[in-house]
Amino acid sequence: MMSSKPQKRRGKPAEKGQQRRKQRNSDAGGQTVKHQSSQRGGRQDVAPNAEKRTRQAEPQWIAMKEGARPAERLPRILESVSADGFHLIDSGHGLKLEQYGNYRIVRPEAQALWPPLLDDKVWQSADAIFTGDTDEDGMGRWRFPHAALGETWPLEIMGIDFLGRFTSFRHVGIFPEQIAHWQWMRDVLKANEQKKRGEPLKVLNLFGYTGVASLVAAAAGAAVTHVDASKKAIGWARENQALSGLGDKPVRWICEDAMKFIEREERRGNHYDIILTDPPKFGRGPNGEVWHLFEHLPRMLDLCRSILKPDALGLVLTAYSIRASFYSVHELMMETMRGFGGIVESGELVIREGGEDGKTPGRALSTSLYARWVPA
């Protein structure tokens, strides 16, 4: 399943922002390269009216469960800062300037409503600029102001080697705000090694994209099942597994609709210690299955609960590009886990600016909502 394209920004940026955009998008000294589409599993951009053209799905409501609601911690802001090969340098006027390995990249960011903090010359040092417009059906273009770059380049985060890639949908192969979840998962897996009883802990990664989270889990000793509806994303994830030297780790790469997969796992009686789920607002599976987050999320979480082990270690939901408060996903998770015990913690994932050196804390850029169930 893949996602809807980003919402089109409204309103005009400040004059300085307009000048900066014109300067960055000019053809002078730059080279425009349009690469093959690289889908983001769980979040592929689609045509602007694709969601409207699709028949509205019927909501899949769940029944009230018996038992007490879990305890709760909220709001909890999970902050990702500089991590190995990534940091957010600056943001503002609808853009963000990021460092990915050796490359500086400028991409649109609708949440960056404030003025940029750093001088124009810092922004002009960018190696790659995404210049696509939402009117282009998501098939955006990258401009390389200083030298033509290849489609891929090596990255390392949390000890995992993988490929960054300039995709036609502006994504680059990793969503760094997820680092906060990955660090939590790695620590939980390490702290619970005694639970293995001769077998590795089991992690299910739904809408797994390029597999970085799956490889973090595998490196921490887990047996991982990675599910994504995009063949391209699965292929990219396999490349990353080979590049990271984790080819001997137990990772199952499954190209399938996430809902169909977890329905089958429930029928088979398979269970997991940790489940990560990062669904899109709208998307399609490999066989044309249609996903609408607001209609299908309740049942998806309910199925996830049904395939958690009784002594499970966590269920994580991240939600992007939706018009909702984190309270919406929080209360859904609370009711989903009613009678299961534990604690639900919810809030936002943010990335903190780090300046040019990655060590100078700046503004916090909100990226998504999340709800996470953990045992008490």
Go through each PLM region and give its residues.
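Conserved SAM-binding loop of SAM-dependent methyltransferases across substrates and taxa
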Residues: T210-A222
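Non-catalytic accessory regions of SAM-dependent methyltransferases
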Residues: M1-Q111, V122
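C-terminal catalytic and target-recognition region of SAM-dependent MTase-like enzymes
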Residues: A312-A376
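Conserved class I S-adenosyl-L-methionine
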Residues: R197-Y209
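S-adenosyl-L-methionine
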Residues: S230-L276
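Non-catalytic substrate-recognition/targeting regions of SAM-dependent transferases
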Residues: L78-Q99, I105-P176, Q183
